[in-house]
């Protein structure tokens, strides 16, 4: 994997076939011990990596309703580290939100896609400072102020994710996503 452009991997197999045991002993532990500059990121749908995470001081991120851990979807990357071709991080966030809402809502119209793009730009213009990044809560406030009926329909449709019971991505990030070892636990 060290010779590849990306060291990412996916392990597939039937239930009980030893996938987690193989990965823990053959990939995770050796990487953490032998390569101190490498990062290990695990998406853990069955809560099988919590023990090894605690043993190695991982940043544990619980992705579930009611979780105390939050990830701000509007966080921007470190602009100094962006490649020259990545010169529109706000446009990238608008595209992320378009894709997210298209996947979780039953329908997003072409007009609403345009509104998402506009609202994202306006949200950063109004709220972004050197010390503050807006959240989906502010994004939702800007959305509700838009004049179009489609914007009001969209505001109602996304309210659960911005101010309701599924607002895990609508708060300021309170976990270290730059930590060397991060486990995203999807089961809790």
Q: What is the meaning of each model-derived region?
A:
Residues 1, 47-59, 65-67, 72-188:
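P-loop NTPase motor domains
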